[in-house]
Amino acid sequence: MTHYIQGQWHTGNGHDVTSINPANGETIWCGKTATAEQVNTAVEAARAAQFDWFMLGFDARLAIVEAYRSQLEANKAELAETIAQETGKPQWETATEVGAMIGKIALSAAAYHKRTGTEANDTPAGRAVIRHKPHGVVAVFGPYNFPGHLPNGHIVPALLAGNTVIFKPSELTPKVAELMVKLWDKAGLPAGVINLVQGEVDTGKALASHPQIDGLFFTGSSRTGHLLHQQYAGHPGKILALEMGGNNPLIIKGVQDIKAAVHDILQSAYISSGQRCTCARRLYVEQGEQGDALIALLVDAVKQIKVGPWNAQPQPFMGSMISETAAKGMVAAQANLLDLGGKVLVELTHLQAGTGLVSPGLIDVTAIDVLPDEEYFGPLLQLVRYGDFDQAIKLANQTRYGLSAGLLADSREDYDYFLARIRAGIVNWNKQITGASGAAPFGGVGASGNHRASAFYAADYCAYPVASVEADAVSLPATLSPGLSL
């Protein structure tokens, strides 16, 4: 059974789809896509369930969401293994993803009250009350790189606010989505409150274009996000939250502990095989002996990164990319940069045919006058040597994206200078730029988003404010307005 609609599992009426373990090419899931008719049934189920779900009240909704957290705790080993099998990420990393899913419950409950709670104040005109109400029926489109944590970051706050959800996961990670929804079912979520439709582009289009959804929350590529933005033009009544990619810069300046700096570079560029939207894509290192020493250490460290299957022992740092197609795409990206004048310092290679296993790459692109402003979504880091700090910041800002950026520097003054000038929604100092806090907003500017930050601020796009002026009874004012008599 592939789809979960109105509290029941259904076989799809579309074409066959499979999910492949990218580390060995084995099929680990198969099903049939949802047709437009099945998507419509899911939307109707969500619509029918929405008002009753809202009227349960926050405390009752929270109790069910906390029951889901208990299910995550009880099934965390199975969920972590499923994520590892389907994405190719090593088990140590998928265990941290499940931990983030569990932690999201308390953070989302806190965010609900802080960002969208109820506030009342007595004023001369009456009691002024600010409340928040759910949008209604929302679609959640999940990505493949964090198939549990990232859609979870939309679904949990949406449900807490009183919305109902149609979840359309990446077609590359359907098994993770199926397990997540089974845990929601075990938690006692009422029928129709969450619905799962699996499929590819046609399924996604049917859901995104459905006239009865009130909002769409998307995490994925900038290209798809821009298409959704165009589609929603002229529909101001629908809320659209886009969390997209980045061509993220990391600048190194005056760091004495170059070993620590190299560690932060590795964690920024190569974790998750470079498949995080916040991964460093461009590295700016000072010209001179100190920069030379750092690069020499970095080259050696990149060459020593362990790559292997998700379940290899001892565990690798990098697992497989999501697919062989993705791996070949990174080889092609490297070749393109070489054609433009780049110089390989560590070659990215496709390690095994039929898999997504690649080695990490490092390429010096200083000689390229105009770098392609592309998000190469994999373990390929572009190095640029710079002369002065202003030049580095100027180059770092030469991107249409604006998701994450970072500075490794011993000087607080340098960081303050950088912070004032860099254009990004996540700006870190002396920390990996893939590091983000669930207690803070997560999002970018430019081609990285549409000013709908997620994580702690996800509550903002899950509800709308309702302002009221209230009194317990109708009463005449002490003085009537001019021209009135009663």
UniProtKB/Swiss-Prot annotation:
One of its GO terms (biological process) is arginine catabolic process to succinate. Catalyzes the NAD-dependent reduction of succinylglutamate semialdehyde into succinylglutamate. Pathway: Amino-acid degradation; L-arginine degradation via AST pathway; L-glutamate and succinate from L-arginine: step 4/5. HAMAP family: Aldedh_AstD (MF_01174). Keywords: Arginine metabolism, NAD, Oxidoreductase. The keyword NAD applies. This is N-succinylglutamate 5-semialdehyde dehydrogenase. The active site is at E243, C277. NAD(+) binds at G220, S221, S222, R223, T224, G225. GO terms for molecular function: succinylglutamate-semialdehyde dehydrogenase activity. Its EC number is 1.2.1.71. The gene is astD. It catalyses: N-succinyl-L-glutamate 5-semialdehyde + NAD(+) + H2O = N-succinyl-L-glutamate + NADH + 2 H(+). It is an enzyme of class 1 (oxidoreductase). Belongs to the aldehyde dehydrogenase family. AstD subfamily.
